[in-house]
């Protein structure tokens, strides 16, 4: 294996659950009782295209030197010294504890590169824990759910960014140079074929060296496979007038103007009432997994019959999953009064999908290859916005002006106070606002803030997450500790 990672953290934050997921089987004992893991375990692990050695450690414990807990801590410290990098795991649901802060300091002193992993991020209230995690000084937290397999693509990207592509793919590239073998069949592999984790059917494969991952979705017979065939310049995918030809999520590598792309064609997504065959149910589920794995999702609409109920349900699903959507109005060659029809489609896009104001939409003909460059320009731009980070200073200068112009309303005779804002994640952009009485804040004012962020910082067409919490600022706790 090319490199070694150590999973480190206080007891009961989910280290062994993450270990089991990455090694592909339940090798580590998992229980709610702290201290279940007493020794460090080392095993070959895989996260999409990353192959490495993984060390599971006992929960870090503060203890007397002659105690069992002290020996467990020694095992953990040995694991840190052996590893190339550390996955420091916290419980986002429980928030930051004094033990987290103590052992984060120990990890920093080791000098090893660190990915801060915010586990249990699917739980209600986890946003506050991720917000507090910045005080550990270990960088931006990577939110995941080890139990449910959520956030694994982001964890993979964080590891590559931390160690660098040359380091993490060194062994793989050496093998490729020695073998000089390329198998075209692998390009069209079914999503999830080469995954060995315990829920392989839930997590699609991630191929190559960080290409832009695009899923192409839509109702049956909207022209998804035809579009991909035109992009690739070959008949890679079966197409025809019959709805539902594509049964699986098919992946294909592509390069557009020097940019590496991973395309996923998905089975047509029907209404639940019409999904009757077991195979088709599995195909739709596979399409949902492709959406969750993708970064940008192209929603292919038949321009002759656009915006049916199912189209809007698909778009809503993509937005709720936090992906970056782009609409392709396909079969544009069949439209006669194009200027009038396009104006009508733009108006419907804005009216029917207000939750992603500024959603990019492009007319294309997948069969004739028209509009594909324009579509891809919008895909790349949307991907850049989806990854955008705004400094805390800029955010709070903007927030000060917003409050001066339109302060929050008074509720029950008391004015709500908005104190502080910071960005806690990207992909999609996520923000936390510190305020008094978050539960009393009207959703209309939250939407007002989101729309202001979108307009001021030029973030059209992507989901924006905004959470409220009670706290003066993220450094208040740190200041108190120094006294």
Curated annotation (Swiss-Prot):
Signal peptide, first to last residue: none
Annotated keywords: GTP-binding, Nucleotide-binding, Repeat, Ribosome biogenesis
Domain EngA-type G residue range list: 3-167, 212-387
Top-level taxon of origin: Bacteria
MF-aspect GO terms: GTP binding
Binding site for GTP 1: 9-16, 56-60, 119-122
GO terms under biological process: ribosome biogenesis
CDD domains xref list: EngA1, EngA2
Chain residues that bind GTP 2: 218-225, 265-269, 330-333
Role description: GTPase that plays an essential role in the late steps of ribosome biogenesis.
Family: Belongs to the TRAFAC class TrmE-Era-EngA-EngB-Septin-like GTPase superfamily. EngA (Der) GTPase family.
Assembly: Associates with the 50S ribosomal subunit.
NCBIfam families the record matches: GTPase_EngA, small_GTP
Name of the featured protein: GTPase Der
Name of the encoding gene: der
């Amino acid at each position: 294996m090319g490199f070694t990672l150590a999973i480190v953290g206080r007891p009961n934050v989910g280290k062994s659950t993450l270990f089991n997921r990455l090694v592909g089987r339940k090798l580590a004992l998992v229980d709610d009782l702290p201290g279940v893991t007493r020794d460090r375990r080392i095993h070959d692990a895989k996260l999409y295209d990353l192959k490495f050695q993984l060390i599971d450690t006992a929960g870090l414990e503060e203890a007397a030197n002659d105690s069992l807990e002290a020996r467990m801590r020694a095992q953990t410290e040995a694991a840190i010294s052996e590893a190339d990098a550390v996955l420091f795991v916290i419980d986002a649901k429980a928030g930051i504890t004094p033990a987290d802060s103590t052992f984060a300091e120990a990890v920093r002193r080791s000098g090893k590169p660190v990915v801060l992993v915010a586990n249990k991020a699917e739980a209600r209230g986890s946003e506050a824990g991720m917000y507090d995690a910045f005080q550990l000084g270990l960088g931006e937290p990577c939110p995941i759910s080890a139990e449910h397999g959520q956030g694994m693509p982001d964890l993979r990207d964080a590891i590559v960014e931390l160690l660098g592509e040359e380091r993490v793919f060194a062994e793989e590239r050496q093998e490729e140079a020695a073998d000089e073998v390329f198998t075209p069949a692998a390009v069209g592999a079914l999503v999830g074929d080469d995954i060995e984790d315990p829920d392989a059917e839930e997590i699609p494969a991630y191929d190559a060296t960080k290409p832009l991952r695009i899923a192409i979705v839509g109702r049956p017979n909207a022209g998804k496979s035809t579009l991909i065939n035109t992009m690739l310049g070959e008949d890679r995918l079966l197409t025809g007038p019959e709805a539902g030809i594509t049964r699986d999520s098919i992946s294909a590598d592509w390069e557009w103007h020097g940019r590496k792309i991973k395309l996923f064609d998905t089975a047509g997504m029907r209404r639940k009432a019409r999904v009757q065959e077991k195979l088709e149910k599995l195909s739709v589920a596979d399409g949902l997994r492709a959406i969750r794995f993708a970064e940008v999702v192209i929603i292919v609409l038949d321009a002759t019959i656009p915006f049916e109920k199912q189209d809007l349900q698909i778009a809503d699903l993509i937005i709720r999953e936090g992906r970056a959507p782009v609409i392709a109005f396909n079969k544009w060659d069949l439209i006669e009064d194009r200027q009038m029809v396009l104006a009508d489609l733009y108006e419907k896009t804005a009216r029917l999908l207000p939750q992603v104001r500024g959603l990019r939409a492009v007319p294309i003909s997948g069969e004739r290859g028209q509009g594909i460059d324009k579509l891809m320009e919008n895909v790349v731009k949307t991907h850049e916005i989806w990854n955008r980070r705004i400094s805390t200073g800029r955010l709070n200068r903007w927030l000060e002006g917003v409050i001066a112009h339109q302060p929050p309303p008074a509720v029950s005779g008391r004015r709500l106070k908005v104190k502080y804002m910071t960005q806690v994640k990207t992909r999609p952009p996520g923000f936390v606002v510190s305020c008094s009485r978050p539960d009393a804040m009207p959703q209309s004012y939250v939407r007002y803030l989101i729309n202001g962020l979108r307009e001021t910082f030029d973030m059209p067409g992507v989901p924006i997450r905004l959470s409220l919490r009670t706290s003066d600022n993220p450094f208040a706790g740190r200041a108190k500790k120094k006294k």
